[in-house]
Amino acid sequence: MATYLIGDVHGCYDELIALLHKVEFTPGKDTLWLTGDLVARGPGSLDVLRYVKSLGDSVRLVLGNHDLHLLAVFAGISRNKPKDRLTPLLEAPDADELLNWLRRQPLLQIDEEKKLVMAHAGITPQWDLQTAKECARDVEAVLSSDSYPFFLDAMYGDMPNNWSPELRGLGRLRFITNAFTRMRFCFPNGQLDMYSKESPEEAPAPLKPWFAIPGPVAEEYSIAFGHWASLEGKGTPEGIYALDTGCCWGGTLTCLRWEDKQYFVQPSNRHKDLGEGEAVAS
């Protein structure tokens, strides 16, 4: 029984299957954790969703910003951009089933026995774990309700960017969504910066990567995240695992076997012929 953590798949179905074959992943015996952004940019978003859904209890995933953007496109709120290569998924006969399943997936995964937490972008240092749990449930409840299109229409935006327990309504939900799915840099007090996408070495002062600012969750738990391909899986403190290594940009798909902390990589099948960018500013 092994636990495998894999970074952002982004529609790279062939690489995902090859990587799982490489590690001899066995559904029903092993567990697969996925950092989100299952879809967009790669050619196989439809196949990725079908496969991941078929794994049932053998998979634990979190939603990423591209997954939320797909839901917004499906709801008629956002435009389907050709570069995201989502049309086969949106036009599939089982699109309703797949996307209604997707919107019921969590923003946060926690394994208390392993002392392991996963979120797509990470955990803001302004939150303790109880706050993170409550905030995740707030957005998950709206996404799984009939009013989810209203939330998806309001989720786009960069403010508010500072956490307060007094936040209410759509502002609260937008902050939570940004913290879980778009965060990279923070100010020293933990306030989110939603504009900088550089590598940590190139970021303007006083910005720091979220994981470089002490927070209560990282004191007690390991944190696995994706989202930040330009990190190339490097430069994080002990106990912080950056797993997005840019497969859809011509990099690799990375897997971490949790029990012995061994890494496995699968090279991308694609040439790096696209400039890096995102369907949702992240």
UniProtKB/Swiss-Prot annotation:
<keyword id="KW-0378">Hydrolase</keyword>
<dbReference type="InterPro" id="IPR004617">
    <property type="entry name" value="ApaH"/>
</dbReference>
<comment type="similarity">
    <text>Belongs to the Ap4A hydrolase family.</text>
</comment>
<comment type="function">
    <text>Hydrolyzes diadenosine 5',5'''-P1,P4-tetraphosphate to yield ADP.</text>
</comment>
<protein>
    <recommendedName>
        <fullName>Bis(5'-nucleosyl)-tetraphosphatase, symmetrical</fullName>
        <ecNumber>3.6.1.41</ecNumber>
    </recommendedName>
</protein>
<dbReference type="InterPro" id="IPR029052">
    <property type="entry name" value="Metallo-depent_PP-like"/>
</dbReference>
<dbReference type="InterPro" id="IPR004843">
    <property type="entry name" value="Calcineurin-like_PHP_ApaH"/>
</dbReference>
<dbReference type="GO" id="GO:0008803">
    <property type="term" value="F:bis(5'-nucleosyl)-tetraphosphatase (symmetrical) activity"/>
</dbReference>
<dbReference type="Pfam" id="PF00149">
    <property type="entry name" value="Metallophos"/>
</dbReference>
